[in-house]
Design a protein with these regions (language model features):
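Walker A (P-loop) ATP-phosphate-binding motif of ABC ATPase nucleotide-binding domains
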Residues: 2
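Hydrophobic anchor at the beta1->P-loop junction of P-loop NTPases
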Residues: 5, 33
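Conserved helicase motor core of SF1/SF2 NTP-dependent helicases
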Residues: 11, 15, 23-29, 35-43, ...
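Short gly/ser/thr-rich secondary-structure transition/capping motifs
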Residues: 64-73, 95, 241-243, 348
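Short beta-strands and strand-coil junctions in structured, solvent-facing domains, enriched
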Residues: 93, 120, 268, 344-346
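Residue-level recognition of short, solvent-exposed, well-ordered loop/turn junctions
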Residues: 106, 252-257, 281, 329
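Conserved helicase motor core of P-loop NTPases
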Residues: 117-270, 274-278
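C-terminal accessory regions
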Residues: 284-370
Length: 370
């Protein structure tokens, strides 16, 4: 039995998951929470207080190339014994992973798929959630009511406006959504720099390094992640005699840099309070804790104080993450978000891309551009 719950931000998807958990526990039914990525699984763990697994971990899919379609279809996944499987952030699931999930559950399993159908589809092939809903075969509940707390948020209300094809409405005060108009890319970059350098900290008393995330549609160009990361690194973590650094493939990794793991690594061990665990997931964000130049090792402290050791030759698994693509941000939320938008990239600026970016911000969203 498969059922779907879909809805935009503030419509109660997480609240319904919590209610489902309470009911299942009262009925003493075995259930499992899961999500497509490590960060999405972590977020549902935080919001529900219950452990959530990645789909890879649930199905014990490891040590295979996510892009090897034939191997993915032939892969013998672990059989899931739980009576109920709840999958959150389902818009990120591609055809191959859904195929493996269906293979892994029993015919009697209740599969509850939760997600926002209007977000970006999966990076891999297929728009699985959208196509299943469009089939009219699977029972689907669409949540439309925006509840009280979310209804006070201009971010949430305007994300819904964008989803409906309407232009956002910007206020000048008492708002969590701001628009800064710029005429050139250079002016846009200067606005980002001044916000990061001093304006945001004086306005909101936040830790810019940890609380702020810059999102952008692209990796290349002046407003892409590569160039923005270099500029933001110079502002937030400039070169210093007190900080060690290493150059790898034209990138400078420096102690205290904000970095992201960009592939799933099932062999990578990490420690928490002296205990060792395995697996670092694509999308995990952390900070370079220490660089051991003598032994050619670099240590990253990820969320939950996971300390991970990298040989210098493994640094292709890391990217700076002061700025990340909107696709990479899926399944995550950030307190403060800066979103540079310029009409030079208008072919990339689809409605669901903007909608996805807007719904990543929890406390403040600043859109900069023309």
């Amino acid at each position: 039995m498969i059922s779907i719950i879909t809805g935009g931000p503030g419509t109660g998807k997480t609240t319904i998951i919590k209610c489902l958990i309470d009911i299942l526990e009262e009925q003493k039914k075995n259930y499992v929470l899961c999500a497509p990525t490590g960060r999405a699984a972590k977020r549902i763990t935080q919001t529900t207080g219950k452990e959530a697994k990645t789909l890879h971990r649930l199905l014990e899919i490891s040590k295979i190339d996510d892009n090897d379609i034939d191997l993915f279809y032939e892969y013998q996944v672990k059989q899931v014994e739980d009576e109920v499987v709840i999958v959150d952030e389902a818009s990120m699931i591609d055809i191959m992973m859904m195929n493996n999930l269906v293979k892994g559950i029993k015919p009697t399993t209740q599969l509850i798929i939760v997600g926002d159908v209007n977000q970006l589809p999966s990076v891999g092939p297929g728009s699985v959630l959208k196509d299943i809903i469009a089939s009219d075969i699977v029972p689907t509940v669409e949540l439309k009511q925006i509840y009280r707390q979310s209804a006070k948020s201009d971010i949430v209300m305007n994300a819904h406006r964008v989803n409906e094809g309407l232009y956002p409405e910007f206020k000048t005060k008492d708002t969590d959504l701001f628009f800064i108009s710029t005429k050139t890319i250079e002016q846009t970059i200067n606005e980002i720099a001044s916000l990061i350098s001093y304006r945001l900290e004086s306005y909101s008393n936040l830790d810019v390094l940890k609380d702020l995330q810059v999102l952008t549609p692209v990796k290349k160009t002046e407003l892409g992640t590569i160039e923005l990361n270099e500029k933001i690194q110079d502002i937030l973590n400039p070169k210093s005699e007190s900080k060690k650094q290493i150059e790898f493939q034209s990138k400078i990794f420096r102690e205290n840099d904000k970095v992201m793991q960009i592939i799933n690594n099932y062999d990578k061990k990490y420690s928490i309070d002296g205990k060792f665990f395995e697996v670092i997931y694509n999308g995990d964000i952390g900070y370079i804790d220490f660089i051991d130049t003598e032994n050619e090792r670099l240590y990253v402290k990820f969320d939950d104080d996971r300390l991970v050791e990298y040989d210098f030759e493994e640094l292709d698994q890391l990217e700076h993450s002061y700025a990340i693509t909107i696709h990479k941000s899926q399944g995550s939320e950030f307190d403060y978000v800066i979103l540079p938008i310029f009409t030079g990239y208008k072919k990339l600026l689809t409605r669901n891309l903007l909608y996805t970016a807007m719904t990543r911000a929890k406390k403040m969203l600043i859109i900069i551009g023309n």
